[in-house]
Regions:
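Outer membrane beta-barrel translocator domains of Type V secretion systems
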Residues: 1-182, 298, 303-305, 309-317
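Solvent-exposed, glycine/polar-rich loop segments of beta-barrel outer-membrane systems
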Residues: 64-71, 108-111, 146-165, 199-221, ...
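Secondary-structure transition into beta-strands, especially the periplasmic turns and strand N-termini
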Residues: 86-89, 126-134, 179-187, 232-243, ...
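Outer membrane beta-barrel transmembrane domains
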Residues: 119-123, 213-320
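Solvent-exposed flexible segments
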Residues: 141, 192-200
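Short, well-structured alpha-helical interface segments that form or flank functional binding sites
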Residues: 166, 184, 222, 226
Length: 320
């Protein structure tokens, strides 16, 4: 259960920070004149922004007692956004899926399966001057995770298997500003909070010899404080690079799970790192007047270096 939840936490951090900052770039009205000079598109009549992000993520996590979780996953995020009338902001909808293969070799544990998620976004610039835009954005998320859990016995004489199902929900809130520097670069600091909730359905591993390992239905809740800063630079008419640094601090968790093993009831707190650091970078290229592509990297590292995550993303976006 901890492995499934950790995977969701890292996916949330990877996609949120990487996508943030792009939501406001919907049409010419929401861009400064400097940015329009360098992007060479974003027609003011374009009210819609759509993008697709296929991605690959690899991470490892030290779980204690010499156990290490290793995971490889790939997925795709698809989103579309539209500017609301009368400068009321930008409303968007997104959906995505992910396939993951995870292993804990010391426990001879395999977890394979899919995730599906969707949500809404809202972005609003509430004050602008010549070089600075102040904004806020909100994101909601619902998701469903299904993992086939297989426990192989010592000596590989057999295995026990079951299916874990987790329903997730959450919301994120950010406030920040985008400021243009003398070299036409843009710096964007943001602060905010994440709420992440999960409900796992009960499941059972029936072992050889009749031992029954039953996991009860469980609820988990996390609240994180988030701070990021992104620096974007236009190099020539079509190229732009971006680098982002961030930190995620867990300020609240309600994450106790219960296991019934034969006649024994065991309870344990879901142990996760309290502090995460995020490093991201990317390069974008304008294909046409109304479309661009970009390549991005996202690294996540936890306090005490117990978690190391690397994600690589390709992004295709168009305005219409």
């Amino acid at each position: 259960v901890r492995n499934v939840n950790l995977s969701r936490i890292l996916r949330e951090a990877t996609t949120q920070v990487f996508v943030s900052g792009k939501e406001g770039e919907v049409n010419g009205k929401s861009l400064s004149q400097l940015e329009q000079l360098h992007t060479n598109h974003r027609d003011e009549n374009s009210q819609n922004h759509t993008f697709v992000i296929p991605y690959y993520q690899n991470f490892s996590a030290d779980l204690g007692n010499d156990a290490k979780l290793k995971s490889n996953s790939s997925g795709m995020l698809i989103a579309t956004q539209r500017e609301l009338p009368n400068d009321y902001g930008v409303l968007g909808i997104y959906t995505g899926f992910e396939n993951a293969e995870q292993k804990v070799n010391a426990q001879r544990l395999d977890l394979d399966g899919n995730s599906y998620y969707a949500g809404l976004t809202y972005n609003h610039s509430f004050y602008e001057d010549d070089l600075t835009t102040y904004f806020m954005n909100l994101t909601t998320k619902l998701d469903y995770i299904e993992r086939d859990v297989t426990k192989t016995y010592l000596g590989y004489i057999g295995s026990a298997s079951s299916t874990a199902k987790v329903f997730g929900y959450g919301a994120n809130a950010r406030v920040g500003l985008s400021h243009y520097l003398k070299n036409d670069a843009k710096i964007t600091p943001q602060i905010g909070f994440n709420y992440l909730g999960m409900h796992s359905k009960p499941f059972t591993l029936n072992h050889l010899g009749g031992t029954r390992e039953h996991y009860y239905s469980q609820n988990f809740n996390f609240i994180d404080a988030v701070a990021t800063i992104k620096y974007e630079t236009p190099w020539i008419n079509r190229f732009k690079t971006a680098v982002a640094l961030g930190t995620i601090i867990n300020v609240y968790k309600d994450a106790e799970g219960t296991l019934h093993l034969d006649n024994n009831f065991l309870s344990s707190e879901l142990d996760i790192a309290r502090l995460y650091g995020v490093v991201q970078g990317g390069i974008s290229y304008d294909l046409t007047k109304d479309s661009d592509i970009s390549l991005g990297y996202s690294g996540i590292f936890s306090s005490a270096n117990t978690i190391r995550s690397h994600a690589f993303m390709f992004r295709y976006a168009w305005w219409w």
